[in-house]
A protein has these predicted regions:
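Structured catalytic/nucleic-acid-binding cores of DNA maintenance enzymes
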Residues: 1-268
Length: 268
């Protein structure tokens, strides 16, 4: 599932390419047809992201809300000059076309039209987003320090911190030597403060570079990444491999429905 930095990159791209002008919105698949017709030809005021949620805000008060889920993707394309639009490929839930570019949305978990009150309701259920300037770490700390749940589960809870996915969760805990099964209330305030600052920095790098880069330069060598074109990780998808720092075998288990990875020596 795309993590928060990906949605912020999409919001910035759509802001740059489409905001401030009328756009054509359609639903080749048909499932979003009625909502698409409501904003077709309207001016896109701005695009924004909160955690893993993307919002297209239109002049007039309507907002398209998208959550990509596990399988959703946007495909961006340049509009052919003086030519017919390219035929949709696959099940395109929403197509948005501006003066120079178009984008096709496929496979989202959510693609819906909301009014301002409904947008506020969605956001009210989310924790602070580390990539937003208004993010207040006091909110997640207040929840975490009272909880018996494992910190590895709390970091993935979007009502506590919005935008953290499985890669950032596992890698952040390794970087700070925290066992993912340690209870939230056993996390020290200084530990959390340092981890929050690091999380903000890491996600900003992801936003800027378009990749999740978490391995420090002094450890960025040796065994290759878990996938082609992916930067190295410390623990994510490295179960059975030696730790890049101490050599201990990386472990994995299921934690609240998602795989967690950790080094039993480096993380306590």
């Amino acid at each position: 599932m795309p993590e928060g930095h990906t949605l912020h990159r999409l919001a910035r791209l759509h802001q740059r390419r489409y905001a401030g002008a009328a756009v054509a919105v359609s639903s080749p698949q048909g499932r979003f047809a009625a909502a698409a017709s409501a904003v077709d030809g309207q001016v896109l005021r701005r695009a924004s992201a909160w955690g893993k949620h993307l919002f297209h805000h239109y002049v007039g008060g309507s907002t398209v809300h998208v959550h990509l889920g596990l399988y959703g993707t946007f495909t961006e394309w340049a509009r052919p000059p003086n030519e017919a639009m390219p035929a949709p490929v696959g099940q395109v839930r929403m197509r948005m076309v501006g003066a120079e570019y178009g984008t096709d949305l496929r496979g989202p978990t959510v693609c819906e039209l909301l009014d301002d009150a409904q947008v506020a309701d969605v956001v009210s259920r989310l924790g602070p987003d580390p990539l937003r300037r208004d993010a207040d770490p006091a909110w997640p700390w207040a929840r975490i320090t009272k909880s018996r749940r494992p910190i590895g589960a709390l970091l993935m809870d979007q009502t506590i911190i919005a935008g953290v996915g499985n890669v950032y969760r596992n890698e952040l805990l390794f970087r700070h030597g925290i066992d993912p099964y340690r209870a939230g209330r056993a996390i020290g305030e200084a530990e959390f403060a340092a981890a929050w600052i690091d999380l903000v920095d890491l996600m900003k790098i992801g936003l800027r570079r378009g990749k999740i880069i978490v391995v420090r330069p002094e450890h960025d060598h040796g065994a290759p990444s878990y996938g082609p074109g992916r930067p190295r990780t410390y623990v994510y998808r490295r179960a059975g491999d030696p730790c890049r720092v101490c050599g201990t075998t990386i472990r994995t288990a299921e934690l609240e429905g998602r795989n967690v990875f950790w080094c039993p020596t480096c993380q306590t």
